[in-house]
Amino acid sequence: MPFSGLFSKSRSSSTRLEGWSLRNILPDSYFKCRNPSASSPSLSLNTLLAGMYASAASCFICTRGCTSGAAPPCNRAKPSLSASSLTTEAGRGFICRKTGCICNGANESAIDSLFVLQNALDCARLTGQTPYTVEVFRPIRNIFNRVREYTRASTTSVGLAWMSKYIYQYHRLMLMNLSPREPATEGWPLFLYPPPHLLVGYQYLVRTCNDYVFDTRSYSRLKYTEIHLPLQQKLNWTVMANCSYTINTGAYHRFIDFENFEETLAQVQQAVLAERVVADLALIRPMRGYGTTNMAGDRQVPVEGLLQDHYKNLSQCQNHAWGLADRMRIQNAGNKDIVILTTIRKLKTAFFNFLVSPRNPHTILSLPCDCLWLDAFMQKFTDPTLSQFQTIQSLPSQSVTKSIISALSLPGPAPCTPLSGGAFELRPRENGRAVTEEMRRRRGEMIERFIDRLPMRRRRRRAPPPPPMSEELSEPEVEAFPPASPPRRSFEEEVRDTIVEAIRLLQEELTVSARNEQFFNFAINFYEVIQRLEMLGNINELTIRRWVMYFFVAEHVATTLNYLHHNLRLYPPCSRWVDLELAQVVMRARDHEGQVVYSRVWNEMGENAFSQLMARVSGDLAATVERAGLGELEEEEMEQFMADIAYHENSGDVSEILRQVAINDTEVDSMELSFRFKVTGPVVFSQNRQIQSINRRVVALASQLRMQHRPLPAQHEQVQLPP
């Protein structure tokens, strides 16, 4: 089982590989003096990689007790192996470098393959330490049958909690450079060596929270739990992180402060939709926010993250607030994902422009029906010059809303029908079949050629689609009851179906981390609300104000949850060893004096908690928009509203929800967004005898001072340890 020796999680029940060291897999010539008192260079990663490939035959380690110097040797006879026979012998099994023991993997179920270097790098990445520090530390996860090598305080949850809080202060120590001879290791309690434990993932968690634009960050006290299973004894650490920041949801001056709001309501609604549409589909600049930025030698500077403070104040950032989540999303994309996401965004933009552009000589695109029209369609309707002829604000808002919902829901089915557009046409051939029929027959071939022309390498080359059926084929025999023909589809529906299929195939090419559509689909909920409100004739100042405010909040929630999901669940080393147990979003609305007007809480459990939270928050906020200005809920309305927002138990007080629904949003000046999440990771123990000895003496002195009611030495103080 790969990765089973060093970091096996509690749910793994077949772990037998206990010891670990790069000395198990690299020749001795790759190692120099590693005495902390000596001044020697660190073992470079290139050297480790070179040794790894040079010693490929010993990448599999025998687990019969000969994986470390402390374990007893194998009882099997040691065959004489020469360099020339190494490959032959290795082909029949796995070679233990400690004893030369050859174990046949086919007959020995106790053999676990371990790509040691991968686990070493995972440990280094998640603890923030260097590979050299990890090599000196020599981590081990499962201490079954080796407990006697450690002090009792090091191997129990109660003892480790005491050591962590009073002796080593792990909550701070794990954030430092723990390499031998570094300043953090001088004096009490480390004495020039790393600590006896490493909390794998803790430093990475703190770094992830620190790299974001939170105003406050707090962490609960570290808790430790013991895991006792057959042939396993392990420890885990758990911490609750609480990170928050405040956004100013005050007056949106572009329209809220109009003196004659009621008289200009239609223009206000059109302005909101036009601004939001431009942001959602990058109508003017489809490439805005894409790619990486390098500044003064710093590579891949997260510009959108650095600028996000600007987006915390709605009255200042104005229309620049729109599209925040999508702009942040692209910062995590690789080169291939950037090409794909850009193309998908352009296809959605082109489809929307096709629906809303007026039919005139400047906007019309006329092509023969037998051409590969998709590329020309995308280029034409994403051309920035097209914005000069846009008349979105003069169109009926219901039409604009339908168009934006249809475009944003791609590649899903069209929620709004019928669709109509007039700026694109395909000219039929003389005496040929219908245009829509020709489009349908040539769809597969056109999409494949469209994707093949993109500047990227596809995952797998697909077989070319069969050519269109020849018109000269003999007519089939007429059946007595011919099958019913499919309903006739409009030209606009055929255009949308083509774009749907193209986007679907493009999404298959995305990496897993770039497929997180669940964080960026919240806009559809809000546009559907606007559509329903207009049908009911309930568009007014209160609904528009709440729609803008909650859309702004949803942008921030989506951006933050996507960041946390990407770093804590999609980053491979973290997802392998660190578990997400609980996630929570708390929204507190405050007035001008800072008093809480209402608060909302959303909870989710499990590995997918972040994405599930986004779905609940967006649906909840969108549903609440419809209740703006309607006052308190009646008894018969309450049950239906709770169903609309998918209310869960332990998700806040119901009275707070009712207060949120009935409040006048002019009282809300700011929103405090708190993101809480509970994570659990593995504790690894050191196999270094010197570290174990120092820890034993440190614990003995600390216990003695505690019994005498004397204070422990200060950090880095030079003290004499007992023998």
UniProtKB/Swiss-Prot annotation:
<feature type="site" description="Cleavage; by adenovirus protease">
    <location>
        <begin position="422"/>
        <end position="423"/>
    </location>
</feature>
<feature type="region of interest" description="Disordered">
    <location>
        <begin position="457"/>
        <end position="492"/>
    </location>
</feature>
<comment type="function">
    <text>Protein covalently bound to the viral DNA that acts as a primer for viral genomic replication by DNA strand displacement. Assembles on the viral origin of replication in an initiation complex with viral polymerase, DBP, host NFIA and host POU2F1/OCT1. The terminal protein stimulates the template activity over 20 fold compared to protein-free templates. Neo-synthesized viral genomes are linked to two preterminal proteins, one for each 5' end.</text>
</comment>
<dbReference type="InterPro" id="IPR003391">
    <property type="entry name" value="Adeno_preterminal"/>
</dbReference>
<feature type="site" description="Priming of strand displacement replication by covalently linking the first nucleotide of the new DNA chain">
    <location>
        <position position="651"/>
    </location>
</feature>
<feature type="site" description="Cleavage; by adenovirus protease">
    <location>
        <begin position="290"/>
        <end position="291"/>
    </location>
</feature>
<dbReference type="GO" id="GO:0044204">
    <property type="term" value="C:host cell nuclear matrix"/>
</dbReference>
<dbReference type="GO" id="GO:0003697">
    <property type="term" value="F:single-stranded DNA binding"/>
</dbReference>
<keyword id="KW-0235">DNA replication</keyword>
<keyword id="KW-1194">Viral DNA replication</keyword>
<dbReference type="Pfam" id="PF02459">
    <property type="entry name" value="Adeno_terminal"/>
</dbReference>
<feature type="modified residue" description="O-(5'-phospho-DNA)-serine">
    <location>
        <position position="651"/>
    </location>
</feature>
<comment type="subunit">
    <text>Heterodimer with the polymerase; this heterodimer binds to bp 9 to 18 of the genome. Interacts with host POU2F1; POU2F1 binds to the auxiliary sequences in the inverted terminal repeats and tethers the pTP-POL heterodimer to the origin DNA thereby participating in the assembly of the pre-initiation complex (POL-TP-DBP-NFIA-POU2F1).</text>
</comment>
<keyword id="KW-1048">Host nucleus</keyword>
<dbReference type="GO" id="GO:0006260">
    <property type="term" value="P:DNA replication"/>
</dbReference>
<comment type="similarity">
    <text>Belongs to the adenoviridae terminal protein family.</text>
</comment>
<keyword id="KW-0190">Covalent protein-DNA linkage</keyword>
<dbReference type="GO" id="GO:0003690">
    <property type="term" value="F:double-stranded DNA binding"/>
</dbReference>
<feature type="short sequence motif" description="Nuclear localization signal">
    <location>
        <begin position="453"/>
        <end position="462"/>
    </location>
</feature>
<keyword id="KW-0597">Phosphoprotein</keyword>
<protein>
    <recommendedName>
        <fullName>Preterminal protein</fullName>
    </recommendedName>
</protein>
<dbReference type="GO" id="GO:0039687">
    <property type="term" value="P:viral DNA strand displacement replication"/>
</dbReference>
<keyword id="KW-0238">DNA-binding</keyword>
